[in-house]
Amino acid sequence: IKTNGLYDKIMSSLKAEGIEVVELGGVESNPKLSLVKSGIELVRKEKVEMILAVGGGSVIDSSKAIACGYYADFDPWLFNIHEKNPTKALPIGVILTISAAGSELSNSCVITNEETKVKSGFNNDIVRPLFSIMDPTLTFSVSKFQTGCGIVDIMMHTLERYLVDEGRNELQLSFCEGLLHSVMEAGKVVINNPSDYEGRATLMLASSFSHNGLTGIGSKMYFTVHKIEHEISGMFDYVAHGAG
């Protein structure tokens, strides 16, 4: 974001409104618990009132974990292993730069504990972002590989809600089928033409709709494939989520 001008645009806009900013960089793919803990220390020290996540799923999920951890007097990892439930979180906003995880509209937060090599997530509406700014032009520079990984993640979020045997209903299935068809068509376009606005816009919307609850309405979800992938990228953190 510092090479494409987005960083400067954001900072100048915030400065123009008199908003003080504290930065936290260093987010990696398969976001790490150690950075979450550093972020919690930072937001407490600086008395941060809101978190603006600029990036993709790793940045957003890190922000969600920090937002919950701000109010926790215990190890924030306990949220991810389901020993504690978050009851309060700092407000979160998003400026999205890649179409993939759908974290910009989801209630999901997945973090990797690099010491134990465990990758685990929790779902709670308290971490659903208040807003997401979604400009498809910000994804024009995303590589073919990362675009492909994103497409796989979007499709798996949808398929794991579609291929269930409890609570299926015609409208929900139609949502899934329409989204999958649109993603496959848009994917073929943007792989060959990364700057195709309509294709990128379709993927960006599909990323959000695949994981905001719409495609799973009324059905029971297990997310077995995602759990298998978490084992892979938890052990080998160089594996991109979509590739895993």
Segments from the language model and where they lie:
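Alpha-helix C-terminal capping segments
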Residues: 45, 63-71, 86, 217, ...
